Amino acid sequence: MNNYKLMIQYDGGRYKGWQRLGNGENTIQGKIETVLSEMVGRKIEIIGSGRTDAGVHALGQVANVKLSENFTVKEVKEYLNRYLPHDISVTEVTLVPDRFHSRYNAKDKTYLYKIWNEDYTHPFMRKYSLHIEKKLHIDNMVKASQLFVGEHDFTAFSNAKSKKKTNTRTIHSITIQDNQGFIDIRVCGDGFLYNMVRKMVGTLIEVGLGEKEPEQVLTILESKDRSQAGFADATGLYLEGISF
């Protein structure tokens, strides 16, 4: 039995997220499993590191799949890229130890959120970034972002559908960079609740627009009140990388 680790990139714009929810669901996981199943002639299931929401993109999703066949990594990669839709790519395939599990062995995940902060639409990135015309106050956003760093109960920044045993997570770092009209927000942590990054970014945007004070981040965290947090569109969000 061979355990293959897949590095995956995708444009999530037309999909219902990563996780296969049932037969016929238009998901990234479902598309990859369909191609692998055709390759080996039986039903195949893969394990993904991160369950991205509908519309969210990935630059560094990781999955693993166990196959009894002795395919080379080149054969697996070439077959997948030949038959997957053009908005899903497998960038690397490697053989890993049998015990490797892409979800349970993941230590940290990094998400990137892209904002186009100019008074005109970016013709090429309009589907891959959130457009905000009003100039954002970056210094206030940076100040607010650092209040997320550390271990906190992120109930206020989770979705009501979240069914985790605990809503406590640790954020290792948040950086905000102004890059030629784009504002790139990177969030690195040990794990994320459903909609957590989008709610964090949405709140930072409200701070940048002057709708909230930076210090209110702590108030919202302590309140555990989901209605107090902002919510950013999925368009600008990317799963950038996972460390093991």
Swiss-Prot record:
GO molecular function: RNA binding; tRNA pseudouridine(38-40) synthase activity
Keywords, comma-separated and alphabetical: Isomerase, tRNA processing
Catalytic activity entry: uridine(38/39/40) in tRNA = pseudouridine(38/39/40) in tRNA
Domain of life, per lineage: Bacteria
InterPro entries reported for this sequence: PsdUridine_synth_cat_dom_sf (IPR020103), PsdUridine_synth_TruA (IPR001406), PsdUridine_synth_TruA_a/b_dom (IPR020097), PsdUridine_synth_TruA_C (IPR020095), TruA/RsuA/RluB/E/F_N (IPR020094)
Enzyme Commission number: 5.4.99.12
Keyword S-adenosyl-L-methionine: no
Disulfide bonds: none
Entry's Gene Ontology BP terms: tRNA pseudouridine synthesis
EC category name: isomerase
Residues where substrate binds: 111
Active-site residues (renumbered): 53 (nucleophile)
Pfam family, one: PseudoU_synth_1
NCBIfam families in the cross-refs: hisT_truA
Subunit text: Homodimer.
Function (record text): Formation of pseudouridine at positions 38, 39 and 40 in the anticodon stem and loop of transfer RNAs.
Stated family: Belongs to the tRNA pseudouridine synthase TruA family.
PANTHER family reported for this sequence: PSEUDOURIDYLATE SYNTHASE, TRNA PSEUDOURIDINE SYNTHASE A 2
Protein name: tRNA pseudouridine synthase A
